[in-house]
Amino acid sequence: MKIYLAGFKGIQNHFNKSTKDIYLLSSFWEHKGGRYKDYVMQKKHILDSGAFTAINDKTGKYKNFDWDIYCDKYISFIKKTKQKLFFELDIDCVVGLKKVEYYRKKIEDAIGIAPIVCWHQNRGSDYWIKCCEDYNYVALGTTTATKIGKKIRSNPWSLKWFINHAHNNNAKIHGLGFTSTKWLRKLNFDSVDSTSWLSGRYGSIFKFKNQKLNQYNPKNKRVKDWYALHIHNFVEWVKFSNFAEKNF
């Protein structure tokens, strides 16, 4: 299993080691201004469309967003940075599924590679079955922001149906934001992504030891150097990611 660590941009100017052997996820939204570093073009990188960020913008700035233009820019960025793995624009709640399928086809036709299809509860189980038959890489949304997401998180065994159906159709499956260290050993996703290493912002400290990633929350302590803590946690998650790739 591959664990892609998201949110690296926050420490990119403070992490002085090579990332070429680290699985990273970044969002087009982070780079849409045209600025990005080499890690975006490395082999072990997966690109998110950034659509979720735009949809959930609290300022209302993107209420009347032109998704046609955004899709065109997304395609241009994928081409320019030679991405091999990238997600579709899963914006069903804004433009509807038919438009999402239109954008998916547009991206595939322009790049020559199908984007990773992102299933959410509104699409229904039949749509998951069809996607597993039609695409070789699919993603499963389990965010707690939705009712079904909360239900799944409370009973992760329910994910087995999705995982098994994907594998039975020779499709790879990605768990969007699913990195429960307890359940990753039990659920055979092909890949997942996580920002959990950034929970240092809440004072959490991670330590990979004896094949386990442990989380500590020291009480009555103040963080003197936030970047040092984030980098420490990032390194420990990289260790866990390396272990997971070989053993999960």
Label every PLM stretch briefly.
Residues 48, 117, 187:
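Conserved, mostly hydrophobic/aromatic
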Residues 1-108, 240-248:
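Non-catalytic, usually N-terminal nucleic-acid engagement modules in DNA/RNA processing proteins
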Residues 44-46, 105-113, 153-183:
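Alpha-helix-loop-beta-strand connector modules within alpha/beta enzyme cores
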Residues 30-40, 93-106, 123-127, 145-164, ...:
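Active-site-adjacent beta->alpha loops and helix N-cap segments on the catalytic face
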Residues 117-149:
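Histidine/lysine/aspartate-rich catalytic loop segments that bind and position anionic ligands
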Residues 62-65, 125-130, 179-194:
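Catalytic cores of alpha/beta
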Residues 139-142, 170-180, 191-196:
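Glycine-rich anion-binding loop/nest that anchors nucleotide
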Residues 201-248:
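C-terminal accessory extensions appended to soluble enzyme cores
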